[in-house]
């Protein structure tokens, strides 16, 4: 079946101060390749075979190579020890595995916006997205499995949980102390996170996003709820519930499993545009195209 283990009898270890212990280095490598939504080809399928799951992950790797050599992917280098997940899709609610319908207001925004967006090339670094610039993928995107850098480290102290994602070296420090409701004044890139324990599950509610780390068109009204539950000695179920009435007609839930990999996985220093020529090449190529078009126009 999947990498996850039975949740019914498993009791996670406790920290010295009596909270469920989620600490360690986890990876989402097994979840790489799981589509967000259930495809038509698996409409009546509850689970893939191991062979189908392996082929799906390989397709996902090959389809996302673009500027990266195949040899440098985690699956090629041998970092990936866990078998590919046989989970059909991440969306588990609605039960059909499909995202809810978008709102009429959001459809109107998309319809009015799309025809007016001209082909653009970056003029300055800020014209490129925060993911391209290796700044942030946002609170939803940062947790998602990718073709590499799927490590996740959790560190706990009394009243706090730190979650560090290998991709873009993002770290969130989440208080689990009782707090009053969310204020409305300050909106940030990663929002305001409030944590609490529900039995053995860490529940994190995120509000007050500024809308600039949008996920699938989400707005600053989005409310994100994240649930982390150890389901076995080496597995942790992660659920994310998105409630954005400005975009979707109802909330929806996704889920996948992290696998504990303390023995051989290490989060080393992450460097992106700081140590290569990606941004320089992107901007200089755009300026070269501008110059070529200007020269062609002058010669007409």
Predicted ranges, named:
Residues 1-300:
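PEST-like low-complexity, intrinsically disordered acidic/proline/serine-rich tracts
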């Amino acid at each position: 079946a999947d990498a996850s283990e039975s949740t019914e009898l498993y009791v996670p270890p406790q920290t010295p101060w009596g909270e469920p212990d989620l600490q360690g280095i986890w990876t989402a490598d097994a979840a790489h390749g799981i589509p967000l939504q259930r495809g038509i080809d698996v409409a009546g399928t509850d689970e893939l075979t191991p062979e189908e799951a392996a082929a799906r992950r390989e397709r996902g790797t090959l389809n996302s190579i673009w500027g990266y050599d195949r040899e440098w992917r985690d699956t090629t280098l041998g970092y990936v020890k866990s078998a590919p997940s046989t989970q059909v899709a991440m969306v588990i609610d609605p039960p059909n595995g499909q995202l809810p319908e978008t709102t009429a207001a959001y459809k109107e925004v998309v319809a009015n916006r799309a025809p007016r967006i001209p082909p653009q090339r970056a003029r300055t670094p800020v014209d490129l997205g925060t993911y391209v610039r290796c700044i942030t993928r946002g609170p939803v995107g940062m947790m998602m499995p990718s073709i590499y850098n799927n490590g996740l480290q959790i560190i706990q102290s009394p009243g706090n949980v730190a979650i560090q994602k290998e991709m873009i070296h993002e770290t969130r420090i989440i208080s689990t102390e009782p707090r009053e409701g969310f204020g409305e004044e300050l909106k940030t890139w990663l929002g305001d996170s409030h944590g609490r324990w529900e039995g053995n599950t860490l529940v994190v509610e995120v509000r007050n996003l500024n809308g600039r780390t949008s996920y699938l068109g989400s707005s600053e009204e989005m409310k994100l709820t994240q649930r982390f539950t150890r389901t076995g000695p080496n597995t942790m179920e992660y659920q994310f519930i998105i409630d954005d009435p400005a975009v979707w007609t109802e909330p929806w839930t996704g889920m996948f499993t992290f696998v504990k990999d303390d023995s051989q996985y290490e989060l080393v220093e992450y460097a992106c545009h700081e140590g290569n020529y990606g941004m320089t090449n992107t901007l200089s190529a755009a300026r070269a195209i501008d110059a070529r078009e200007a020269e062609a126009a002058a010669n007409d």
